[in-house]
Amino acid sequence: MADSSPALSLREGGPRAPRPSAPSPPPRSRSGSESEEAELSLSLARTKTRSYGSTASVRAPLGAGVIERHVEHRVRAGDTLQGIALKYGVTMEQIKRANKLFTNDCIFLKKTLNIPVISEKPLLFNGLNSIDSPENETADNSFSQEEEPVVAGEDLPPPSPQESDVQPVQPEEVSARDFLQRLDLQIKLSTQAAKKLKEESRDEESPYATSLYHS
């Protein structure tokens, strides 16, 4: 009994051996997580969202090649926010944001609405020069000057020699005497033709009459 007491005292009150701890997972690199978040934000920025009741998509923010202008729309009795958005090709949220509307029925609290219409500038095919360059502006101005109509009363350039040589055909002047002579000639010819036709018809009827007489 005396021999077993020290062993019991060691088991009950003695210091215990430390347990082996589980290996901790390797720390995740912050650069990898940041790159994933950046890719996710870019993919969300590229996606186009559509709102209910509108065919227009949310376009890119204003920058190169995009112009935003406001069109004034007069509110009428039968207008709806959805119909106005479809008419101008914008979203209902854009109209609400531009006019500070809280609900769809708030459009009747205003007489006019500002519609934000976004239009894109057409760019050249190479993508290096836009329509707004000075060269294109001069080309547009020259093209518009060519299309200007000629105002009545302006001095026209003199006609070319070829055009001046071509003169319209003047109607032949007929005197009263010539006119009467031509009229008499036509009457004479008509009378002769009628007399000839009458003689031919008489000659055709005469054999038929003699045959009836002899019969």
From Swiss-Prot:
<feature type="region of interest" description="Disordered">
    <location>
        <begin position="193"/>
        <end position="215"/>
    </location>
</feature>
<keyword id="KW-0597">Phosphoprotein</keyword>
<feature type="modified residue" description="N-acetylalanine">
    <location>
        <position position="2"/>
    </location>
</feature>
<feature type="region of interest" description="Disordered">
    <location>
        <begin position="132"/>
        <end position="175"/>
    </location>
</feature>
<dbReference type="InterPro" id="IPR036779">
    <property type="entry name" value="LysM_dom_sf"/>
</dbReference>
<feature type="modified residue" description="Phosphoserine">
    <location>
        <position position="57"/>
    </location>
</feature>
<feature type="region of interest" description="Disordered">
    <location>
        <begin position="1"/>
        <end position="40"/>
    </location>
</feature>
<dbReference type="InterPro" id="IPR045030">
    <property type="entry name" value="LYSM1-4"/>
</dbReference>
<feature type="compositionally biased region" description="Pro residues">
    <location>
        <begin position="17"/>
        <end position="28"/>
    </location>
</feature>
<feature type="modified residue" description="Phosphoserine">
    <location>
        <position position="24"/>
    </location>
</feature>
<feature type="modified residue" description="Phosphoserine">
    <location>
        <position position="5"/>
    </location>
</feature>
<protein>
    <recommendedName>
        <fullName>LysM and putative peptidoglycan-binding domain-containing protein 2</fullName>
    </recommendedName>
</protein>
<feature type="modified residue" description="Phosphoserine">
    <location>
        <position position="33"/>
    </location>
</feature>
<dbReference type="Pfam" id="PF01476">
    <property type="entry name" value="LysM"/>
</dbReference>
<feature type="domain" description="LysM">
    <location>
        <begin position="71"/>
        <end position="115"/>
    </location>
</feature>
<feature type="compositionally biased region" description="Basic and acidic residues">
    <location>
        <begin position="196"/>
        <end position="205"/>
    </location>
</feature>
<keyword id="KW-0007">Acetylation</keyword>
<dbReference type="InterPro" id="IPR018392">
    <property type="entry name" value="LysM_dom"/>
</dbReference>
